[in-house]
Amino acid sequence: RGGFSMGSLSADASWCGRDVLAVDDLSDAMLGELFRTASRMRAMVASRGSTDALKGRVLANVFYEPSTRTMCSFDAAMKRLGGEVISVSESTSSAKKGETIEDTVRCLECYCDALVM
């Protein structure tokens, strides 16, 4: 029964603290490693139903526009991999009080490992 670790994704310093806003922000090598890691994670979840590969990690889903499928797919994937999810929408954020999206992101990145927008 082989375990899983984030391997070269987490060991590679080029991923640390990086903002990925578009696929063009990733090199071919990074994309290749990302897809290989995703494939291993998918196979693991398919064979076991879930895993704790991302236990202790927190994902923030930040959606200011309605998005059922995208938001739910990231939420389900993170939970199947053992992580936790914080969901933020415009109605639940401080945007209602005038906070900018940039300020919201700065705040969330202090206690989340990844943000999906």
Predicted regions and their residues:
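Positively charged, low-complexity intrinsically disordered leader regions
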Residues: 4-76
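Active-site cofactor/substrate anionic-group-binding motifs, chiefly glycine-
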Residues: 58-112
